[in-house]
UniProtKB/Swiss-Prot annotation:
It comes from Thermosipho africanus (strain TCF52B). The keyword Cytoplasm applies. GO terms for cellular component: cytosol. Gene3D superfamilies: Ribosome maturation factor RimP, C-terminal domain, RimP-like superfamily, N-terminal. This is Ribosome maturation factor RimP. The keyword Chloroplast does not apply. Keywords: Cytoplasm, Ribosome biogenesis. GO terms for biological process: ribosomal small subunit assembly; translation. It holds the Pfam family RimP_N.
Length: 148
């Protein structure tokens, strides 16, 4: 299974590069006897459109059919990370300055707006307008929050 994911990753990264997109995640798994291949793409400069997903899906599907590396039948989906996307790098925090986030630390969860990122410190404005400094290496999990 690792070999399949590795090969799909190569194919998906190549397809993403062609359309100026980035590969965000790949999952290949069996659920209730059916195989699923989920590819998540990102556009670092804009949003991911349905056309982006369609283009990557066609490219990947074509290459997978041509190379015949997945022996069983599977369902392919291509999507974006979503509105509540995870923030997985310091660059993600920089990219989403002024956006609302939910950050889980060891013993607390904080919701606020990213105001700045310097070195490996995130400056977060909480509801009370107080700025909290959070070291990146203390973050267990972080996601964008939908701001209504």
């Amino acid at each position: 299974m690792k070999e399949i994911v590795s090969k799909v990753k190569e194919i998906a990264e190549s397809a993403c590069k062609k359309y100026n997109l980035e590969l965000f995640d790949i999952k290949y798994y069996n659920k209730s006897g059916k195989w699923f291949l989920e590819i998540v793409i990102d556009n670092p400069l804009d949003y991911v459109s349905t056309k982006d997903c369609e283009n990557i899906s066609r490219e990947v599907e074509f290459q997978l059919d041509k190379l015949d590396i997945i022996p069983q039948r599977y369902y392919l989906t291509v999507s974006s990370p979503g509105l509540d996307r995870p923030l997985r790098s310091i660059d993600d925090f920089k990219r989403f300055i002024n956006n609302k986030v939910k950050i889980k630390l060891e013993n607390e969860t904080i919701i606020g707006y990213i105001k700045d990122v310097k070195d490996s410190v995130i400056f977060l404005e909480e509801n009370n307008k107080k700025i909290k400094e959070i070291k990146y290496n203390q973050i267990k999990k972080a996601n964008l929050e939908i701001d209504i």
